[in-house]
Amino acid sequence: MLRRVPWILLLAAGARADAPVAEPSDPAARAWVAQLDMHVLPRESGYLSLIATSAQKAVVGGRALAVQSQVYYMLTRELPANYLHWLASDDTHILIDGGPVDYFIFHPDGRAEKVTLGRDVAAGQVLVVPVPGGCWKALRLHPGAGFALMANALSPEWTPDRVRIGAGEAWIARYRGAAPWATDAFLRELIGPNFTP
């Protein structure tokens, strides 16, 4: 049995609800926003709609959490980046429509990888991106793409105390040079407006 998740959970993370909304220019993206009742995700950016949370529970860190929660998430030309954040939960992204999207994943052991979510499997793109819990990640819509709509499954459920948004110089120093693209300037760009000096 699944239950709807209240939108207020996202606001509990200290996010601002009054951020200006950038309406998508792509007609299909506009239709998805309306049909899925999507809202701009404060701080991380992009559009989000909560689907449900599993009624099954698991004990994690001494407390009972739902085994899984699911959301729709979308990037658009107007909101093409999902800024750097860390999740305690495993976060599996499944492409529904549009794309491609680059995922920049930063592992606790210092490794960094780039994975492209898209339909061109022959070119190395993937339809599903599993991001292990405890990793940092940021997403960027490919230039020229109108939007990318994904379904995300978070296991165990998303809770506001199990996410961190943004980073600073120490984080940049840790991942600098971990991949050819991991320059100071690009890592700072992935952090976006959530840079913490």
Spans of features found by a protein language model:
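Non-catalytic, conserved peripheral segments adjacent to functional cores
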Residues: 20-129, 138-139, 145-146, 156-159, ...
